């Protein structure tokens, strides 16, 4: 469930996605809220933010708002990241290396379909820029570790 998607279709990936990293982070945080409330992943967008806040406040007895829920979701994402980083380091793996898409998604063009001939990023530099921007937005170090 620790995934995200873009809120609106972005079209075929024929240009850098670096400008979409902020939307990706926001989407991930919203998915954490939805998953924490045990809402169906396939019903994304059906339950409004206001209803989720009202439900949260009713269940917990707290008085919070959507912005605070998103902040808590970011903390939850960071906790999951911290666990992953610790695990990877115990195995001797570099966290930044673990964030790369598989070789196949990065280098092997799709053989058919609407995105025929495309790969995950425009090029290696684009992939690096996207990862660096994602880390920056999350407040992590350049190596993908919580700061």
Regions found by a protein language model. Name each.
Residues 1-147:
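Extended C-terminal regions of large enzymes
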């Amino acid at each position: 469930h620790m995934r995200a998607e873009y809120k609106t279709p972005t079209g075929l990936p024929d240009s850098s996605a670096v400008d979409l990293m902020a939307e990706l982070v926001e989407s991930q945080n919203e998915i954490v809220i939805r998953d924490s409330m045990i809402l169906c992943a396939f019903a994304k967008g059906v339950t409004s933010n206001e209803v989720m806040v009202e439900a949260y406040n009713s269940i917990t007895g707290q008085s919070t708002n959507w912005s605070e829920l998103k902040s808590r979701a970011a903390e939850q994402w960071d906790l999951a990241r911290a666990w992953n980083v610790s695990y990877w380091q115990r195995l001797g793996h570099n966290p930044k290396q673990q964030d790369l898409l598989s070789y196949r998604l990065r280098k092997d063009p799709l053989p058919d379909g609407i995105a025929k001939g495309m790969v995950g990023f425009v090029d290696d530099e684009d992939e690096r820029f996207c990862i660096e921007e994602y880390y920056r937005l999350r407040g992590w170090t350049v190596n993908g570790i919580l700061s």
